[in-house]
Amino acid sequence: MAIRRLFAGLVIAILILGITSVATAETLNYKFYTRVVKSETFLIPDVDGHEVGLNVRDGVYAFENGDVAFGTTIVFFDRTKGVGSLNQYGTLTFRDGSTVVTRTVGTTGGTAAKSTGEIIHGTGRFQGIKGTVMSPEIKFFRLEKGESHPKSFGDGILNYTLPPK
């Protein structure tokens, strides 16, 4: 009798544990290329070269798993002679229509920038996503004639979990 109860308890435990899914952490590394499509800059007359503003960047994001996304990033900046801080909201739209929205903060130093932040929203296969995003080094091309801001490229990392299905 005791063996039957033990066996029944074991079967029930296996069924319960088997039905419950656990969210697992995922990491997606990517490369990106962006360009400024809109820009507005305002000079602040407190010190030489101080400016604030925003720009909108569009670009392509290629992930190491073969996935590709189109990205739009709204960048708010405060810098003096090209060095300062930035706050960004980015939206990655994947080929299947799923999206990942991020909010990052960072620094810019003339020819390079870096940012870290969090994933704040997702749709489609990324519904319920939670996690972080990081671009350890964003590099800028030389400013070309007629450009208000240079094109950028770099690497990034998405670390995230999705809710159990």
Residue ranges and their predicted role:
Residues 1-10:
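Bacterial N-terminal signal peptides that target proteins for export
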Residues 24-165:
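Beta-strand-enriched cores of mature, soluble protein domains
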